[in-house]
Amino acid sequence: MLSIFTTFTDPKKRMDPWEEALECYKDFADEVIVTGKDWKPEFTWKDIGKNFQDGFNLSNGDWVIRMDIDYFFHEKSKERLLNALKNSTDYPAIAIPQYQFFTVGRYQLKTRLCIILNKKKFPNIKLNGGGDYCLATLNGSLITPNSVPN
């Protein structure tokens, strides 16, 4: 089973593409979890990690994907993603590229993100690492893109 979780508070006001994102996630996952609807009006970094951890904890999938509400998967990526899940069961995560798009044909690789998490084999993953308190850790150590399949 594959779960995707995301967070948002007031996506209409922020003009987030939330409806499109949720439809995209439903096409990929067996369940979609949304947290953060009760986020405090005053922003704090620790709230991000808490909401991400809530999403991970509520997810029932063997694999769990953390998606920001403005992240999307390309429809042609599904088969490749499912193959990566099958071939990476001994790892706590899979890193995927994050692209920054400027125009339809102009984009660049921005970074690699460890947002696909193996909850079945590593249920103790925490989303409390990094300067923003929301990167994936295992046993207190940051899960880095260089330590997992890409």
Predicted feature locations:
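Active-site-proximal specificity loops/subdomain of glycosyltransferases
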Residues: 2-20, 24, 30-66, 72-77
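Weak global preference for isoleucine
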Residues: 4, 33, 48, 65, ...
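Short linear motifs at secondary-structure transitions and domain/linker junctions
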Residues: 6-11, 39-42, 70-71, 93, ...
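Catalytic-site signature of metal-activated, phosphate-bearing donor transferases
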Residues: 53, 76-150
